[in-house]
Amino acid sequence: MKVMEGNLVGTGLKIAIVISRFNEFITSKLLSGAMDGLKRHGVNENDVTVAWVPGAFEIPLIAKKLAESRQYDAVIALGAVIRGATSHYDYVCNEVAKGVSHAALSTGTPVIFGVLTTDTIEQAIERAGTKAGNKGWEAAVSAIEMANLLRTFA
């Protein structure tokens, strides 16, 4: 049996991060976690590009543009969508998830979904570096693994 998997060595990888400014008190913590994860796995800080967008809904377009540029081995999408009193939450979450998936599938570049979709601010805080770890860190490690896995197809 042949097993294919990516390693977690980030040396030489070029990574783009698309991050939402909305809920920045959460997303900035996701970015810190992602940068820490990338650096600890050997990605040079100079090989990381960060693109800020107004909100989560704008993430897919910029993620796709970055992936299409072929300058990056992976793109990480970071954001925080917190449920409110209207159905807006559902629309945003669904469209962002579909858009990020489409960006990856249409370009062949890994686009990692690191967008929190939580019911409460407390849940978002927990996932941005407290009780439930840091989903930015997890997204960074996934980006490294997927970039290296895709290299096995070259």
UniProtKB/Swiss-Prot annotation:
Its EC number is 2.5.1.78. Pathway: Cofactor biosynthesis; riboflavin biosynthesis; riboflavin from 2-hydroxy-3-oxobutyl phosphate and 5-amino-6-(D-ribitylamino)uracil: step 1/2. The keyword Transferase applies. InterPro entries: LS (IPR034964), LS/RS (IPR002180), LS/RS_sf (IPR036467). One of its GO terms (cellular component) is cytosol. 5-amino-6-(D-ribitylamino)uracil binds at F22, A56, F57, E58, A80, V81, I82, F113. The active site is at H88. It catalyses: (2S)-2-hydroxy-3-oxobutyl phosphate + 5-amino-6-(D-ribitylamino)uracil = 6,7-dimethyl-8-(1-D-ribityl)lumazine + phosphate + 2 H2O + H(+). Keywords: Riboflavin biosynthesis, Transferase. GO terms for biological process: riboflavin biosynthetic process. GO terms for molecular function: 6,7-dimethyl-8-ribityllumazine synthase activity. (2S)-2-hydroxy-3-oxobutyl phosphate binds at A85, T86, R127. It comes from the Bacteria. Gene3D superfamilies: Lumazine/riboflavin synthase. The keyword Transferase applies. It is an enzyme of class 2 (transferase). Coiled coil: none annotated. Pfam families: DMRL_synthase (PF00885). Signal peptide: none annotated. Catalyzes the formation of 6,7-dimethyl-8-ribityllumazine by condensation of 5-amino-6-(D-ribitylamino)uracil with 3,4-dihydroxy-2-butanone 4-phosphate. This is the penultimate step in the biosynthesis of riboflavin. NCBIfam families: lumazine-synth, PRK00061.1-4. Forms an icosahedral capsid composed of 60 subunits, arranged as a dodecamer of pentamers. Belongs to the DMRL synthase family. This is 6,7-dimethyl-8-ribityllumazine synthase. It comes from Geobacillus sp. (strain WCH70). The lineage of its organism: Bacteria, Bacillati, Bacillota, Bacilli, Bacillales.
